[in-house]
Amino acid sequence: MDCTLVDSTCVVERAWGCWANRHDVSLEAVLWFSHGRPTIATMEHFLPGRDHAQELDEMDRYEETELEGIVAVRGAMQVVGALRKHPWAIVTSARRTLAEARVTAAGLPLPKVIVPADEIRNGKPDPEGFLRAAELLEVPPKECLVFEDTRPGIEAGMNAGMQVVAILTTVAANKLRHRPFIQDFRDVTIRPEGDHLKVDVIQVRLPDK
């Protein structure tokens, strides 16, 4: 969701900046590790063996109320608009309340299916979230198309047996191991074709060897 549909970089950096400063942890390292992972996974990675329940709750409350500056990524409004009458889902490492708050703040409509981190056991790169979304959408995984911007997310989609297109908002092309990628959703057009949707991914490129 973050940096795939919505750009919440300003809020995320402020939240993790406070946390990193409090614990004398490198903010750069925290931001690199945290993207695409549940908040609790990042806290446990840098400060293992602690009870993070209170800090997790505090960060969630902060992020759910600090929404200024959150916008839709380029092209997202057009793509989501084309999906209004068709099944699509958000699979996110955020909690449900945070996901709904950020999508709404960005001016995007909410899909009927959201699979947040607090409703599954295993986060990305485990495929559980994507498989759950396919189940709720009643669509076979092999017929699902995933757009992801992080390596854990890309791996999760692949592990679910889905087709994956990477978005170069946070991951570098030379890190994609020959996965197709786009710059942003302006490279994508969606149109109905009978009972199905035809997705044209324009300017799909493969990373150089």
Say what each PLM segment does.
Residues 4, 92, 149:
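Conserved G/P- and acidic residue-centered "switch" motifs that form tight phosphate/ATP-binding loops
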Residues 72, 91, 122:
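Residue-level marker of regulatory loop/turn positions in helix-turn-helix DNA-binding domains and
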